[in-house]
Curated annotation (Swiss-Prot):
SUPFAM superfamilies: Peptidyl-tRNA hydrolase-like (SSF53178). Gene3D superfamilies: Peptidyl-tRNA hydrolase. It catalyses: an N-acyl-L-alpha-aminoacyl-tRNA + H2O = an N-acyl-L-amino acid + a tRNA + H(+). The keyword Metal-binding does not apply. This is Peptidyl-tRNA hydrolase. One of its GO terms (biological process) is protein quality control for misfolded or incompletely synthesized proteins. HAMAP family: Pept_tRNA_hydro_bact (MF_00083). Monomer. It is found in: Cytoplasm. The record marks 9 as: Discriminates between blocked and unblocked aminoacyl-tRNA. Coiled coil: none annotated. The gene is pth. NCBIfam families: pth. GO terms for cellular component: cytoplasm.
Amino acid sequence: MWLIAGLGNPGLQYQNNRHNIGFMAIDAIYQSFSFSPWSKKFQAEISTGLINGKKTFLLKPQTFMNLSGQAIGEALRFYKLDLKNFIVIYDELDLPPGRVRVKIGGGNNGHNGIKSIDAHCGTDYCRIRLGIGRPNSKELVYQHVLGNFTKSDQEWLPSLLEAIAKNIALLIKGNKCLFMNEISQAMKNKNLQ
């Protein structure tokens, strides 16, 4: 069994924010595979399906970003899942828009959602970091992450989300490098990298 969580903030006013790219990726995965209708459990929206023949839970915490670990921790404990079977998808200021990095474990780089998960669950899980870029001034970070994706972002965002959904099974198989290569190739094929 696997748990894939996307980070974001609940509510219509946040749905197109850069900070919600994790939710967007989960929605893309949901639409690409046969998953159950969303239900509410563990302070989250959750759906069940199969990816690569493995039972997989998709989860979108409804606790707001800074408390994401509460919902994720509840789900991991309830399903008795090991951190090696947990993937989280979230926004990354320190990557250019449209870039992706995957790593196991590590620090939180100041991301409050990741801080919360680390505190509630531990640190040895797979992280898919999706670049949203960093504004020129530190004072603009809050406004940037809670700002909506722009029209120019729509040149790369749908392609990135589609590539993640199309290739997520590679991560479940343990092929981190191939996952990264396939996403990079998909973006290059659309002249986006």
